[in-house]
Amino acid sequence: MTVLFWDIDGTLLTTAKGGMFAWDDAVKEITGRDFQLQTLRIPGMTDYQIAAKTCELLGLERSEELAHRLVRRYEELLPSSLPRRTGHVLPNVREVLEALRDRTDVVSYLRTGNTRGGATAKLTHYGLIDFFPTGAFAEDTKERATIAVRALALAREAGPVAEDHAFVIGDTPHDIECANAIGVRTIAVATGGYSVEELRAHHPWRVFEALPPVDEFLRLVGLPPASARASARQAHSA
């Protein structure tokens, strides 16, 4: 069985910074302070890392309770904030997910720094929610490596996971670190906040400008392309 662990922002989709409205409004409501999330380089940061950094920059006492309130209000505001910018699903993503959907030799999990609520809002808005029945989220941790360990444990509940048949797909050095932490391969894509050169410096297994087209992606992760499977079925029926 091939196992794929997918990041969201910059890998599956871009909100075109639509989520920043929700964060800035949440900070204003809860702290009374003005804040612009665009002042941070957030690719690769978890929602709770963003909360902690926000408090630090505003000179507020960092507390789990305040971080929790910020994140929960952000989740509530996110569905109405996303339409304020024209985000989109990134190249080849929908086609690849469609090609994987009905296969029995591969399973996809989310492995994301979003909380479950944030991930659900984004995937629902961009029409990708049905491709991901489950995953590991940043519910109570700031560390991506912890999320990766949880994602791997989730996959192992369904059966053995071979290192050479398991892949993290992501767009930041943090995703590469996560893959290394759990001993699987990284497919890095430069569709987020980092260039191919920046990603390559962290030694991913493979790096691309964007997610490869369907057949190339399937071959990359060791799966026969749909065309080959169709030919095999025709030969068998003949």
Range-by-range predicted roles:
Residues 48-62, 151-154:
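Helix-loop "lid/cap" segments that line or gate small-molecule binding pockets
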Residues 1-6, 62, 219, 224-238:
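Non-catalytic pre-domain segments flanking phosphatase-related domains
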Residues 1-43, 49, 55-57:
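Active-site neighborhood of HAD-like aspartate-dependent phosphohydrolases
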Residues 93-124, 136-142:
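Substrate-recognition element of Asp-dependent hydrolases with the DxDx(T/V) motif
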Residues 145, 149-177:
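Conserved Lys-Pro-Asp/Glu-containing loop-to-beta segment of HAD-superfamily phosphomonoesterases
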Residues 168-206:
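Acidic, Mg2+-coordinating phosphoryl-transfer loop and its flanking beta/alpha structural elements
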Residues 56-99:
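Metal-dependent phosphoesterase signature
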Residues 38-39, 43, 67-68, 129-142:
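A short, structured active-site edge motif that brings together acidic residues
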